[in-house]
UniProtKB/Swiss-Prot annotation:
InterPro entries found in the cross-reference section: RsmH, SAM-dep_MeTrfase_MraW_recog, SAM-dependent_MTases_sf
Homology family: Belongs to the methyltransferase superfamily. RsmH family.
Keywords in alphabetical order: Cytoplasm, Methyltransferase, rRNA processing, S-adenosyl-L-methionine, Transferase
Name of the featured protein: Ribosomal RNA small subunit methyltransferase H
Gene Ontology MF: a single term: rRNA (cytosine-N4-)-methyltransferase activity
EC number: 2.1.1.199
Superkingdom: Bacteria
Keyword Transcription regulation: no
């Protein structure tokens, strides 16, 4: 396990997210608050600073290193579950005063060669958020066919050279055996991508695609968003920070879908299903934060409030 004290993580939109979640800059109202993606605990610690004695904070994370970091928090108001945030659905109905989701990969995950998330470091081609279960990227690439590989890279990486990359992976597998390290994959992708985007490593989209796929990130996000509707109490807030267009599109469409009345075309005279969310805000990091933490550049936070009308 990596030493999380040496791999620093700067929390993106720290105060903005907590203020949006709590409905202002003052003390948190009493209730149960959810940090659905604990990471290295930046948001959780800030929420606890604002939480009254009767408040509670429940966090989720499937990364064993995040659970290790959470053990350093001795506050009795805090608890964490070693599971993905799709398990929000296990919480009691209308029990949460607010839910925060900070999507994507933390700096310690990216900067740990043994986790295999980054083409910048040579390490095992793993990319699992939860290293205690599931198959690694290397294991999947060792058996997937060309069509499957191309589909994943195209869908989750929006990579126009997905076909050539998939063929190169299959050819390498047939000639020399499966890919096992991040450097091997990065070099292979660089040879298959014929044109380069300025300022971007040619392997960026492929690594993103494989990470999203192997962790079922978009499916988990959709499940967690759906669960939030049931778990949020009326007036409770949902704040979601995303880092790429695929995530943000899902969040944007989800909020839009539930921020309007829905009519049943099969029953034109029936009362419409009431709106269940009210869109509140869209916030991006300011120039100062981006200068201090370039990884914040792509972040966008969307905030919505659960309406008073029962679902």
């Amino acid at each position: 396990m990596a030493d999380t004290t040496t791999l620093l993580h700067t929390t993106v939109l720290l105060d903005e997210a907590v203020d949006a979640l709590l409905g202002g800059a003052g003390p948190a109202p009493a209730g149960v608050w959810i940090d659905a993606t604990f990471g290295r605990g930046g948001h959780s610690r800030r929420i606890l600073e604002r939480l009254g004695p009767d408040g509670r904070l429940v966090a989720f994370d499937k990364d064993p290193e995040a659970i290790h970091e959470a053990a350093r928090i001795t506050d009795a108001r805090f608890s964490i579950r070693h599971e993905g945030f799709r398990h929000l659905a296990d919480l009691p109905e209308r029990s949460a005063a607010g839910i925060l989701m900070d999507l994507g990969v933390s700096s310690p995950q990216i900067d740990s060669p043994e986790r295999g998330f980054s083409f910048r470091f040579d390490g095992p081609l793993d990319m699992r958020m939860d290293t205690t279960r599931g198959e690694s990227v290397a294991d999947w690439l060792a058996t997937a066919d060309v069509g499957q590989i191309a589909e994943v890279i195209r869908e989750y990486g929006e990579e126009r050279f997905a076909g050539p990359i998939a063929k190169a992976i299959a050819a390498r597998r047939a000639e020399r055996g499966p890919l096992r390290t991040t450097s091997e994959l990065a070099q292979l992708v660089a040879g298959a991508v014929k044109t380069r985007e300025a300022g971007q490593n040619p392997a960026t989209r492929t690594f993103q695609a494989l990470r999203i796929f192997i962790n079922a990130e978009l499916e988990e996000l959709q499940a967690a968003l759906e669960a939030s509707l049931r778990v949020l109490a009326p007036g409770g807030r949902l704040a979601v920070i995303s880092f790429h267009s695929l995530e943000d599109r899902i969040v944007k469409q989800f909020i839009a879908q539930h921020s309007r009345e829905v009519y049943d075309r099969r029953a034109p005279f029936a009362a419409p299903q009431p709106m269940r969310l009210k869109a509140l805000d869209r916030i991006k990091p300011g120039a100062c934060e981006v200068d201090a933490n370039p990884r914040a550049r792509s972040a966008v936070m969307r905030v919505a409030e659960r309406t008073e009308v029962p679902a």
